[in-house]
């Protein structure tokens, strides 16, 4: 890494006669073009297909998540059709936008070269790189978090009301994608409490403007919840594990920590922790360090505490990586200037991140164990749909029923006519499918029931149909590899 500038702001430095911003722009353009090509090399993931089904049922919110992912997919498929490209198009653009916001944040807080290094590190962290081509809630969440981080610093530095209003709107839009984005308001409040020069903003017309803008932007979620009996609260309650008695599960904490080492890579994650502690101890008097710590530590601490009681998914900490990357680069650039012999550690860490990220991208095209294939959930669905379509044609069925939203969503996306699919009847609010009209069984109704793993019928399905038989058992395949085991039953009433 090159030595850092002594300035605390943006500088027009040159690298081989070219500004770092121009290198970053070229890098973003090349990476974006690659991702637009690569994202069509494999099928949708179950969550992507599920959100695509949501996009066909416009609503102000959905049972499991906010509405923005469905709205974004609806726009993508409006432009490019119901295709993998249409579903994922905006994921790639959002990732490019996130990279730009990361670069600008580091540029504002430090200098051009620090910003360029942050761009490079962001591209080789597996969690961010792999997630950049999947149209889930994460590209939206991370983009709006990064934009909010930039806007809040602009708001603090300038005091201009337009930045405070836009900040609230951006955090509100992030909330429409992923509810964790509201925590950014807490992060900002913590910084304002911590930083004496900025403390006057804590209770002011500026912060009030931010809260009002956030309320307006996030209003669809609250209005939908009022109408549906706060289903989002129920879903969050179920996923968090707090509906069970609290207990300390050290194995879950260990699982959480090891998963972070995996999705960030061990050396980069350890380097991030060292940077956090080092800057906290030695440069905590700087407003920019306080700000970055306020954007990084709360999310990490919250999920670490949550892992004591329940399982935490590796991708949940993704928004915190925006500040984490800047902390990492800022600390280690300064440290290596003082201790040049440690330069090899930085290069090994970057090299490991690059190798892991490249390996994850090419793994799907080689016969490796599924547990090492980052995209295995997005493989085999075309062959799955071929088996279902063959069973439909052979048995002349009226309905398609799945035991889980994964199969139901994939059948609806990959079958040629995009038929409406159903899940067995369940309690209202149990899943998004329960909020839509269900199927009706009459005399002579014939249906296919698609299940995974075990050839079992649910009791509710048995109650609705008086005859059933297994008509197909198969493995979905991708490049000659077995991916997942499925069973298709024919159900009928006579």
What are these regions (language model features)?
Residues 89-109, 147, 151:
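Transmembrane-helix motifs of polytopic, lipid-linked glycan transferases
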Residues 107-113, 148-164:
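Membrane-interface transmembrane helices that cradle and orient dolichyl/undecaprenyl
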């Amino acid at each position: 890494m090159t030595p850092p500038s002594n300035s605390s702001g943006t500088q027009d430095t040159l690298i081989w006669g070219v500004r770092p911003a121009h290198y970053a722009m070229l890098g973003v353009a090349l990476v974006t073009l690659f991702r637009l090509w690569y994202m069509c090399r494999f099928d949708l993931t179950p969550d992507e297909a599920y959100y695509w089904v949501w996009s066909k049922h416009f609503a102000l919110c959905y049972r499991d998540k906010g509405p923005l992912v469905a709205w974004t997919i609806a726009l993508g498929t409006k432009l490019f059709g119901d295709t993998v490209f249409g579903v994922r198009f905006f994921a790639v653009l959002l990732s490019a936008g996130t990279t730009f916001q990361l670069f600008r944040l580091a540029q504002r807080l430090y200098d051009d070269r620090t910003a360029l290094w942050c761009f490079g590190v962001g591209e080789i962290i597996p969690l961010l790189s792999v997630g950049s081509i999947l149209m889930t809630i994460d590209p939206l969440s991370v983009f709006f978090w990064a934009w909010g981080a930039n806007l809040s610093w602009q708001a603090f530095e300038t005091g201009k009301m337009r930045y405070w209003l836009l900040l609230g709107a951006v955090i509100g839009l992030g909330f429409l994608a992923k509810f964790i984005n509201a925590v950014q308001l807490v992060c900002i409040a913590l910084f304002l409490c911590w930083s004496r020069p900025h403390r006057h903003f804590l209770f002011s017309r500026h912060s009030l403007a931010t809260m009002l803008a956030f309320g307006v932007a996030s209003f669809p979620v609250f209005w939908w919840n009022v109408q549906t009996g706060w289903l989002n609260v129920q879903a969050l309650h179920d996923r968090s594990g707090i509906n069970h008695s609290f207990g300390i599960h050290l194995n879950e904490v260990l699982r959480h920590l090891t998963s972070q080492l995996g999705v960030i890579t061990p050396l980069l994650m350890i380097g991030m922790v060292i940077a956090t502690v080092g800057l906290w101890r030695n440069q905590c008097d700087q407003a920019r360090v306080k700000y970055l710590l306020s954007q990084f530590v709360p999310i990490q601490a919250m999920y670490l505490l949550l892992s004591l009681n329940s399982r935490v998914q590796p991708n949940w900490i993704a928004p915190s990586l925006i500040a984490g990357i800047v902390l990492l680069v800022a600390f280690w650039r300064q440290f290596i200037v003082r201790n040049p012999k440690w330069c090899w550690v930085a290069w090994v860490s970057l090299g490991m991140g690059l190798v892991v990220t490249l390996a994850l991208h090419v793994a799907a095209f080689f016969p490796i164990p599924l547990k090492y294939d980052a995209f295995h959930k997005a493989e085999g669905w075309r062959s799955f749909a071929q088996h279902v379509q063959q069973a439909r044609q052979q048995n002349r069925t009226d309905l398609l029923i799945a035991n889980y939203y994964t199969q139901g969503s994939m059948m609806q996306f990959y079958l040629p006519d995009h038929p409406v699919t159903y899940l067995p009847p369940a309690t209202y609010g149990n899943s998004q499918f329960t909020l839509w009209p269900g199927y009706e069984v009459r005399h002579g109704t014939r249906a296919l029931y698609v299940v995974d793993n075990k050839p079992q019928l649910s009791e509710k399905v048995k109650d609705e149909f008086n005859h059933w038989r297994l008509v197909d058992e198969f493995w979905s395949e991708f490049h000659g590899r077995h991916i997942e085991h499925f069973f298709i039953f024919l159900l009928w009433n006579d």
